[in-house]
């Protein structure tokens, strides 16, 4: 039942994406984080240790609450009718996955350039990256879009599928809460260096396995989408650790090698130049078509993840059933 529900949610995500008018659980999570942050900061001592403790409470409480709430809803739906539980789990899976939205927002950058030039493209890419886009040239904008697809292939699709297949919608929603916490408070700036410490470390931990599986799946599907599997494997082995995060360079290095591009490197954040190592080799100049190539790679790896993770769950269920 869970496998079919997740597959239905995945299909719905590819078909419909995230309509702006539809309420989304991530928005609710964001509001809960904002609400809880102020109260937790006031409830704990105003010291580094106290602030870290407050952040730890939030890092544990929100994913647990989201998972339990989802489990409760599914349980109530199941008491009414098994079919209603299936629909609810498929709906939750649809809300958790972000393949279509990642594709739409990245391709919108190239579309903006074709319609409005560099200024429009900078504005479009500014919606999906945290760096200062006003200083980017054409190649810089295209590179930022490709990097976004590569970095979020795991967080937005593969990792949610991984946890959905392990623990259904409750575990998938708990993962989404961890991911949302990291995106909101997992920064190493003055405000969040202590409060966001637990959230950032938890996000690193839960993404450790999925990010590596995502990179391997990207390499595996390269021949299907006409990209360089050998190059992807070579650059992944060489550059997968070239990032401050233990996970971010996994998929980025595989994508860079598959496309024959050099990604990452120095970038401007809040008016300051941040030095970061490059990933990949500049076998050729980046072009606007690389955004579409990166999205095809992401989508192919996502479908592969659905099949592989679903088959693994089915095998475990059958094995457990045979032992019973």
Language-model region placement:
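Hydrophobic alpha-helical transmembrane segments
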Residues: 1-174, 178, 186-324
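Solvent-exposed interhelical
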Residues: 183
């Amino acid at each position: 039942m869970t496998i079919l529900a997740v597959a239905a949610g995945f299909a719905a995500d590819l078909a419909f994406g995230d309509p702006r008018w539809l309420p989304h659980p991530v928005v609710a999570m964001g509001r809960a984080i904002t609400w809880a942050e102020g109260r937790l900061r006031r409830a704990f001592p105003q010291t580094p240790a106290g602030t870290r403790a407050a952040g730890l409470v939030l890092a544990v409480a929100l994913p647990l609450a989201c998972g339990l709430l989802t489990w409760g809803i599914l349980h109530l739906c199941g008491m009414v009718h098994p079919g209603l539980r299936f629909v609810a789990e498929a709906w939750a899976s649809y809300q958790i996955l972000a393949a279509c939205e990642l594709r739409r927002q990245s391709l919108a950058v190239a579309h903006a350039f074709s319609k409005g030039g560099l200024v429009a493209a900078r504005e479009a890419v500014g919606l999906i990256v945290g760096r200062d886009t006003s200083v980017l040239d054409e190649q810089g904008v295209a590179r930022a879009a490709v990097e976004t697809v590569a970095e979020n292939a795991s967080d937005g699709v593969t990792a949610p599928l991984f946890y959905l297949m392990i623990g259904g919608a409750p575990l998938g929603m708990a993962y989404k809460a961890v991911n949302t916490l990291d995106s909101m408070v997992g920064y190493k700036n003055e405000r969040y260096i202590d409060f966001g410490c637990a959230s950032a470390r938890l996000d690193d931990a839960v993404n450790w396995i999925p990010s590596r599986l995502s990179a391997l799946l990207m390499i595996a599907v390269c021949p299907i989408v006409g990209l360089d599997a050998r190059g992807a494997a070579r650059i992944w082995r060489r550059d997968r650790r070239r990032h401050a995060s233990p996970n971010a360079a996994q998929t980025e290095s595989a994508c860079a090698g598959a496309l024959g591009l050099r990604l990452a490197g120095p970038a401007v954040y809040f008016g300051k130049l941040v030095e970061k190592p490059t990933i990949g080799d500049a076998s050729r100049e980046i072009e606007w078509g690389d955004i579409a190539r990166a999205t095809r790679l992401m989508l192919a790896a996502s479908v592969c993840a659905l099949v592989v993770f679903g088959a693994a769950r089915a095998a475990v269920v059958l094995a457990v059933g045979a032992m019973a």
